[in-house]
Amino acid sequence: MSQLDLLNIVHRPRRLRRTAALRNLVQENTLTVNDLVFPLFVMPGTNAVEEVPSMPGSFRFTIDRAVEECKELYDLGIQAIDLFGIPEKKTEDGSEAYNDNGILQQAIRAIKKAVPELCIMTDVALDPFTPFGHDGLVRDGIILNDETVEVLQKMAVSHAEAGADFVSPSDMMDGRIGAIREALDESDHSDVGILSYAAKYASSFYGPFRDALHSAPQFGDKSTYQMNPANTDEAMKEVELDIIEGADIVMVKPGLAYLDIVWRTKERFDVPVAIYHVSGEYAMVKAAAANGWIDEERVMMESLLCMKRAGADIIFTYYAKEAAKKLR
C-alpha cells in the first residue's frame, strides 16, 4: 500500500503504543510494592528453613529465621506479612491455636520486636491446629459452626495480645466476623483490624498450601463451608455480611480464576479489597517456567497487574519478594 493509499482513519490507538514513554504515560493501572503482602509460614525449631516441595522458591521458617526474612522484606519495601503457623501438636479441640506460647503468638512477638513498623496480619482458622485438617471443630464428621467461632474468638484475641495489627479469619464460618470484632473490642483491642476472607471458594488451587502447613483435610472436602465456584451472587452476600459485622478489609480467594468476583466486589462495596494469589496459581507458573514454556518474571508481573486492574487494592502473593525486587 503506497503513501497515497493510506486508510482514512481518524482514531489510531496504536499512536499511544508507539514508544515505551507513551505507553507509560497512558497506563491505566500501576502495580507498586505497597500493594503486596507476603504470606509467611512459621514452624517449630531453631535456625532452619525448609523449601515447600510443591512450591519451589517458597519456604517454611523457624521463628528466628522468620525474623531475618521479615527484616529483608521490609528493606525491600514490603510493609505487610500474613503469618501462618505449623504447631508442634494438633488437638481435637484446637486449643493450641490460642496458646499464649503457641507458634503464631511467639512469632508475632519476635517479629514485632525486631521490625516494629511491619504490619503483621495473622491467619485465624483451625485447619493447621487439629488432626482433621478442617477449618473448624469436628463432631461425627460434621464441621461445627458456633463452637468453632468461640475458638476463633480466643485465637484472634491471643494474636492481638501478642501484637498483631490485623487478624485474617480464613475459616468461612457463619457469623465469625461479628463475634471476633466483639471479642477484640471487649478485650481492649479495638484498634486491631479484621481482614475477612469474605469470598473464599472451595477451590482445587489450594493443594500446595496445604502441603506447606501439613493441613490437608483428612476426610471429605470443604464444600460445606467454603463457597461453590459456580456462584457470584452468593459472594456478594458473603461480602456484605462481613462488612456489616465489622470487616475492615475483604478478600476474594483464589485470585486469577476469580477476577470477576474482585471486580464485582470493588464496584459494589466501598471498602479495600484484597485478593490472594494462591499456591496452586504460583505452582503452575513455577512448573511451566521450569520447563521453559513461559517467561516466569513476565508472567508473574502480568498476573499481579491483572489483579490490580480487576480492582484489588491489596495482593497476597508468594511472589511478593521477587516482585518487590523487580519494582525497585
Curated annotation (Swiss-Prot):
Gene Ontology MF annotations: porphobilinogen synthase activity; zinc ion binding
Coiled coil: none
GO cellular component labels: cytosol
Active-site feature positions: K200 (schiff-base intermediate with substrate), K253 (schiff-base intermediate with substrate)
Activation and inhibition: Stimulated by magnesium, inhibited by zinc.
Keyword Lyase in annotation: yes
UniProt pathway annotation: Porphyrin-containing compound metabolism; protoporphyrin-IX biosynthesis; coproporphyrinogen-III from 5-aminolevulinate: step 1/4
Principal EC category: lyase
Binding sites annotated in the UniProt record for 5-aminolevulinate 1: R210, K222
Catalytic reaction annotation: 2 5-aminolevulinate = porphobilinogen + 2 H2O + H(+)
Keywords of this entry: Heme biosynthesis, Lyase, Magnesium, Metal-binding, Porphyrin biosynthesis
Matching SMART domains: ALAD
Domain of life per record: Bacteria
Annotated residues for binding of 5-aminolevulinate 2: S279, Y318
EC numbers: 4.2.1.24
Record: residues binding Mg(2+): E238
Biological processes per GO annotation: protoporphyrinogen IX biosynthetic process
Family: Belongs to the ALAD family.
Chain's role: Catalyzes an early step in the biosynthesis of tetrapyrroles. Binds two molecules of 5-aminolevulinate per subunit, each at a distinct site, and catalyzes their condensation to form porphobilinogen.
Extra information: Does not seem to have a metal requirement for activity.
Protein name as annotated: Delta-aminolevulinic acid dehydratase
UniProt gene name: hemB
